[in-house]
Amino acid sequence: MKLNKYIDHTLLKPEATKEQIEKVIEEAKEYDFASVCVNPTWVKLAAEGLSGSDVKVCTVIGFPLGATTPEVKAFETKNAIENGADEIDMVINIGALKSGNLDLLERDIQAVVEASGEKLVKVIIETCLLTDQEKVLACQVSQKAGADFVKTSTGFSTGGATVEDVALMRQTVGPDMGVKASGGARSYDDAQAFIKAGATRIGASSGVAIMKGETASGNY
């Protein structure tokens, strides 16, 4: 697979303007990225802008804290799909995981999986807040709940993806589930390191810099 098709071209900062979102959409079409990842308020604009292209519309649910209820996440998911979303990146209930409430954690993920129908679901586990044991548990529960991907990070917490976390996640889920590295790829070399570790998708605001072989600044 070509590098461009690993990249979810991402703009999730709360202050993003319509003009900035439109720029990301145009860049994604130019480089034929896997998707554009935007907040739910921009999904309709992205769907219109990407109509007729191969670039998917990705959005985020329960973002960035993951601390809403399963019912709210399910509603958000359905609303996003009605507006044109093809892929759903949800944040887990991190507190449930930390409290050992794996039933709630699974129900949280399942609610989004069921609401998404046939759409792709990626589960953000926020690795920077977890122990290695919790990372493994989060991946196992995501897999059991029927998600398509596990994803490292929101890009809005204390840290982003590391090669070590990607490798651990890949080792945990095996070959049949996607692993998305986000919040750490700022250069071509970063992207290649994540792919080598087992990532099948990379979330980055630096997609253009990565494709040009440059290094970008920023935290996502």
Curated annotation (Swiss-Prot):
EC assignment: 4.1.2.4
Residues forming the catalytic site: 89 (proton donor/acceptor), 151 (schiff-base intermediate with acetaldehyde), 180 (proton donor/acceptor)
Uppermost EC category: lyase
UniProt keywords, alphabetically: Cytoplasm, Lyase, Schiff base
Pathway membership, UniProt: Carbohydrate degradation; 2-deoxy-D-ribose 1-phosphate degradation; D-glyceraldehyde 3-phosphate and acetaldehyde from 2-deoxy-alpha-D-ribose 1-phosphate: step 2/2
UniProt record similarity statement: Belongs to the DeoC/FbaB aldolase family. DeoC type 1 subfamily.
Name used for this protein in its record: Deoxyribose-phosphate aldolase
Species this chain originates from: Streptococcus gordonii (strain Challis / ATCC 35105 / BCRC 15272 / CH1 / DL1 / V288)
Gene that produces this protein: deoC
